[in-house]
């Protein structure tokens, strides 16, 4: 079996970020842990943020994250690129600059040709090279399924950290990539997605969030996260709860893959979407006009999704224009931060 014949999605049970442990299970596993206290740990496990931040000096802090998962596309090289872009995204979401990375690999050596792993690593390495990141090592284990990702370290100024918990009333929320990758990945696995859509989704998933992060650095951004395995509403709920505010989302303005809605109608929805809804659905109020399939889309676990940026309202149009000017064509204002209802997401 070689990398020219294998369909990676047929070799795994889960796909991409949809393979994450259910958020409720993770919450129970972490609840009540006696975490070490360190005054230089600026962002840690006490909040569900995108990366940890540790202060080295008054003007330098380390940003650290790790992300890996099974393949959501069939091509090994593309999978490597997507996994690397997804892992690097956490650093960008915090406002940091990624510097070094280490490979995390699980590989079924008895059933898969080693050329597959070579292609995966080459894809990841090329994406790291594009990001200006140095690969310094890695770790492998033999497993029944292929998994790949990165542990990433970046730099940030301690006073310029972006977290999920600083939403301000009136902020506009901007999304930089379309939703629906979890549903589309399920369709790819089922052999239903055509080549044009598959190529378009791969292009978006391999796109670094670097350009969006660079652009938002010139604006008054109060909070940011990247949309990944807990879905749009799952990650937004974390922001709302941590910030002590509410959010209003306009469903018609949310960028998405139209094909994902068609497959949602067919029930082609990853299990992670149901886990996300079960855990965070209590924070969401849907208007009567929001269809069931669109509700499913908003809980769909994303792989290498876009940034969700909270920006001062008087700068929102300029930020969207600047994002589009860099090639992020789907960037759009999808909602606003409101004072009430407290800790609620209203989708209209």
Swiss-Prot record:
Keywords from the UniProt entry: ATP-binding, Kinase, Magnesium, Metal-binding, Nucleotide-binding, Selenium, Transferase
A Pfam family this chain is assigned to: AIRS
Sites where the protein binds ATP: 20, 47-49, 67, 90, 138-140
Tagged with keyword Hydrolase: no
GO CC, alphabetical: cytoplasm
Enzyme Commission (EC) number: 2.7.9.3
Active site: 17
Binding sites annotated in the UniProt record for Mg(2+): 50, 90, 226
The organism's place on the tree of life at top rank: Bacteria
Reaction(s) the record says it catalyses: hydrogenselenide + ATP + H2O = selenophosphate + AMP + phosphate + 2 H(+)
GO biological process: selenocysteine biosynthetic process
Cofactor: Mg(2+)
A molecular function GO annotation: magnesium ion binding
Enzyme class per UniProt: transferase
Gene3D superfamilies: PurM-like C-terminal domain, PurM-like, N-terminal domain
Site label Important for catalytic activity, positions: 20
Cofactor note: Binds 1 Mg(2+) ion per monomer.
InterPro entries, alphabetized: PurM-like_C_dom, PurM-like_C_sf, PurM-like_N, PurM-like_N_sf, SelD_I, SPS/SelD
Bilayer-spanning residue ranges: none
Function of the protein: Synthesizes selenophosphate from selenide and ATP.
Subunit (UniProt): Homodimer.
Family: Belongs to the selenophosphate synthase 1 family. Class I subfamily.
Name of the protein in question: Selenide, water dikinase
Organism: Pelobacter propionicus (strain DSM 2379 / NBRC 103807 / OttBd1)
Encoding gene (name): selD
């Amino acid at each position: 079996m070689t990398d020219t014949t294998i369909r990676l999605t047929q070799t795994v049970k889960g796909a991409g970020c949809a393979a994450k442990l259910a958020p409720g299970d993770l919450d129970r596993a972490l609840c009540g842990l006696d975490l070490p206290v360190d005054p230089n740990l600026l962002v840690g496990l006490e909040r569900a943020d995108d990366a940890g931040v540790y202060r080295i000096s008054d003007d330098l802090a380390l940003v650290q994250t790790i992300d890996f998962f099974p393949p959501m596309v069939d091509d090994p090289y593309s999978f490597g690129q997507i996994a690397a872009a997804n892992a690097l995204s956490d650093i960008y979401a915090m406002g940091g600059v990624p510097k070094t990375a280490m490979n995390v690999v699980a590989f079924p050596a008895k059933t898969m040709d080693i050329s597959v792993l070579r292609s995966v690593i080459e894809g990841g390495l090329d994406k790291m090279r594009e990001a200006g990141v140095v690969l310094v090592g890695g770790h492998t284990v033999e497993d029944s399924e292929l998994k790949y990702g990165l542990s990433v370290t970046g730099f940030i100024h301690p006073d310029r950290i972006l977290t999920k918990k600083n939403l301000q009333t009136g902020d506009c929320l901007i999304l930089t990539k379309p939703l629906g990758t979890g549903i589309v990945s399920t369709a790819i696995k089922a052999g239903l997605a055509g080549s044009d859509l598959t190529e378009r989704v791969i292009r978006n998933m391999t796109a670094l969030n670097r350009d969006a992060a660079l652009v938002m650095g010139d604006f008054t951004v109060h909070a940011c996260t990247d949309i990944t395995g807990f879905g749009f509403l799952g990650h937004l709920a974390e922001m709302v709860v941590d910030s002590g505010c509410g959010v209003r989302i306009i469903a018609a303005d949310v960028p998405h893959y139209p094909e994902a809605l068609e497959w949602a109608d067919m029930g082609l929805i990853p299990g992670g979407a149901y886990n996300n809804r079960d855990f965070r659905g209590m924070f969401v109020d849907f208007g009567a006009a929001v269809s069931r399939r669109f509700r499913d889309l908003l809980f769909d676990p994303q792989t290498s999704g876009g940034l969700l940026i909270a920006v001062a309202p008087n700068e929102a149009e300029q930020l969207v224009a600047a994002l589009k000017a860099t090639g992020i064509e789907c960037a759009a204002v999808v909602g606003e931060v409101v004072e009430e209802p407290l800790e609620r997401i209203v989708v209209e």
